[in-house]
Design a protein with these regions (language model features):
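Charged phosphate-binding loop/patch that engages nucleotide di/tri-phosphates or the phosphate backbone
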Residues: 143-185
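RecA-like P-loop NTPase motor core
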Residues: 1-45
Length: 185
């Protein structure tokens, strides 16, 4: 499988290399790259979801598992959503929405409650609550226009996280991530 890599160069010199992985358990596959970067004087920053006990993770557990997989290297680790709680990138997104758009999530939460409390008994079995990725997708879908071009902006690679109509980039919730990145760049 082809590695996802992005390089950020300043004055023609690569300063930042971003290595995409399929998930935290893949990290041992790039351990040689981590060691090589370390030997060349680089700093290794690792950013993953902390996950929750519901998907065999959690902040403390995930951090330890990553340390175990990359033992013998020096890395700085940040786990979404805020480098202290269980959760994922989508939890961070949920906490940085523009507050004027909070009613969209209020509706979503009512939908989840309805599925659990009303629809499940009527269907005769427990229903699956859609993933948090779906919640973020629906949030953006509700805010963006109906044209094909606007709908494209809902998808991961085309999302505009600088759009202050959608996201509050000044919220204190982002401070742990901002501090982590600022400290190491």
């Amino acid at each position: 499988k082809k590695k996802k890599v992005a390089n950020i160069s300043i004055d023609g010199i690569t300063k930042i290399r971003i290595q995409g992985l399929e998930g935290w358990s893949d990290i041992q596959n790039v351990k040689p790259d981590i060691k090589r970067n370390e030997e060349n004087g680089g700093v290794n920053l690792i950013i993953f979801d902390a996950d929750t006990i519901h998907n065999e993770g959690g902040f403390d557990k995930r951090k330890q598992e990553i340390h175990d997989k990359i033992s013998g290297t020096t890395c700085e680790i940040f786990l979404f959503p805020n480098n202290q709680d269980d959760g994922a990138l989508e939890d961070l997104f949920e906490n940085i929405i523009n507050t004027k758009n909070a009613p969209i999530f209020d509706c979503w939460n009512k939908f989840e409650t309805c599925l659990q409390d009303s629809a499940s008994p009527k269907v005769g079995r427990d229903l699956t609550i859609p993933a948090k990725k779906s919640k973020i997708y629906v949030y953006l879908e509700a805010l963006l226009g109906k044209s094909k071009e606007e709908k494209k902006k809902i998808k991961d690679p085309f999302r505009n996280f600088d759009d202050t109509d959608h996201w509050d980039l000044d919220t204190d919730y982002l401070n742990p991530l901002k501090d982590f990145i600022t400290k190491h760049l």
